[in-house]
């Protein structure tokens, strides 16, 4: 018997972090919700990260996903921008980990290849394929569409690729260890 799995995809960014929630039952995907969490660019970095943390925590608490997928950071010529993206990505990894949820990470080109069939697909192609795969999806910003694409990628690869458990606290040690152990046990079923 196949059960529904709620998958939260996160596209990290300091200005806008996209999120998308789908349900996967076997190979059948259903759209649940999506949006963006924003931070105020006029605030100091620490307060912007707090805004992202609070926003993602609300999403995780409200929608109670079973698994989370986050896009990996790519390095570009602007080291400062890459570092800021790294900060936002750390928040995107931390929030579900604190909630005891398993987190998978996917490279941007794998997301593009999975969703559009081309590892170098343009954003418009990704959005069109997300809309094709999830006809009820309503997204106003590319960040939300990208997050849905990340969730779709996880749904496609979760059975073939073991979740990276290096970030999980060993059962019996550290805060949230019982929740993490329970989440990992659910994956092993």
Swiss-Prot record:
- Binding-site positions, Mg(2+) 2: 71
* Cofactor requirement: Mg(2+)
Is DNA damage among the key words of this record? yes
Report the sequence similarity comment from the record.
Belongs to the RuvC family.
* Keywords noted in UniProt: Cytoplasm, DNA damage, DNA recombination, DNA repair, DNA-binding, Endonuclease, Hydrolase, Magnesium, Metal-binding, Nuclease
Which residues does the Swiss-Prot or TrEMBL record annotate as the active site?
11, 71, 143
Q: How is this protein named in the record?
A: Crossover junction endodeoxyribonuclease RuvC
């Amino acid at each position: 018997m196949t059960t529904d799995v709620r998958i939260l995809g996160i596209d990290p960014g300091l200005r806008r972090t996209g999120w998308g929630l789908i349900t996967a039952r076997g190979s059948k995907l259903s759209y649940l919700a999506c949006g963006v969490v924003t931070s105020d660019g006029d605030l100091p970095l620490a307060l912007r990260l707090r805004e992202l943390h609070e926003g993602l925590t609300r999403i995780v608490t409200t929608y109670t996903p079973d698994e989370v997928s986050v896009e990996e950071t790519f390095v570009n010529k602007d080291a400062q921008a890459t570092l800021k993206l790294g900060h936002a990505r750390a928040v995107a990894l931390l929030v579900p980990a604190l909630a005891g949820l398993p987190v998978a990470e996917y490279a941007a080109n794998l997301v593009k290849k999975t969703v559009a069939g081309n590892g170098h697909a343009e954003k418009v192609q990704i959005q069109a394929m997300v809309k094709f795969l999830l006809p009820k999806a309503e997204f106003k910003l590319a960040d939300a569409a990208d997050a849905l694409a990340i969730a779709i990628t996880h749904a496609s690869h979760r059975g073939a690729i073991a979740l990276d458990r290096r970030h999980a606290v060993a059962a019996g040690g550290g805060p949230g260890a019982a929740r993490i152990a329970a989440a990992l046990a659910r994956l092993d079923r």
